[in-house]
């Protein structure tokens, strides 16, 4: 039965290959690639041969032995004279002159046995010789022809299609939607910085690290990860609302993409309005030459986004100021004690660091800080 199936499928595949109008394009592309590869190998061989001839025209390096990072012993041949040179970073010293009885073949054989070939030109030359062997050539070439009999060669990429909905709107096929989604991922960092609580959290963590006097502990990766997960925790009610009101209807094809974007922006806009000061909104409205609004829902994103970021920066610095005060007091006390004891050469930060860490641990600083940050957002 398998032989019958193969006997039915194989003729159709061969017929499709040799009767298709695209066979000329496939063959021309295949031979074009082969020709380019052969030309590239020929050019590289010529370049390597020119370099070898140019380097060995007057002086020939017979052997070389490395003694250190910048020290080596080299045997060179100038006409019939063989010199042993000691080479360092700043000097070249003549060590010995070999007798003319020593043949180059003996030295070359020792070099081949002791030292492996590390020259790129020699490796390329050897590769070209291996490639041009008949057995290797006969094994590689049939593979290119076998690719022609693979049915996947004729696979086509589905083109983008559009569909007209009942309400007259237009929607696109899934590949276009996927392309738009992947393109929108490039705006994810800007989304995290401009429309969530990430900015305030990461600034406060950075100021806390400076107040403690530990510029490398916790490391940046830990702070970014903690700020990211804390952002998802604080923004989870907003994200749930976006998921229910925008993504679910869009995935069920109840609304199109434009409506999903508009409905998804409403919860984010509400979150940003709750964190933004009125003074910042008035400032950017004045810069945009907009007098007033009937309600806050009419504020456009081009005014709300910079106002929200400005308010977040101001709030983050206010929280950082309150964090600095107890650690600053410890620094002043330690510096005063060291001055009174006459230990002016001892840096106060070295002595005050253990006291800062002890104070931060005793008051359960991380829990206190995370709780205060979470409660500082109006959701």
From Swiss-Prot:
It is found in: Cell membrane; Bacterial flagellum basal body. The keyword Nucleus does not apply. The keyword Membrane applies. InterPro entries: Flagellar_biosynth_FliO, FliP, T3SS_IM_P. The chain crosses the membrane at residues 23-43, 140-160, 178-198, 222-242, 319-339, 357-377. Keywords: Bacterial flagellum, Bacterial flagellum biogenesis, Bacterial flagellum protein export, Cell membrane, Membrane, Protein transport, Transmembrane, Transmembrane helix, Transport. It is a multi-pass membrane protein. One of its GO terms (biological process) is bacterial-type flagellum organization. GO terms for cellular component: bacterial-type flagellum basal body; plasma membrane. Pfam families: FliO (PF04347), FliP (PF00813). Plays a role in the flagellum-specific transport system. NCBIfam families: FliO_TIGR, fliP, PRK12797.1. Belongs to the FliP/MopC/SpaP family. This is Flagellar biosynthetic protein FliP. It comes from Buchnera aphidicola subsp. Schizaphis graminum (strain Sg).
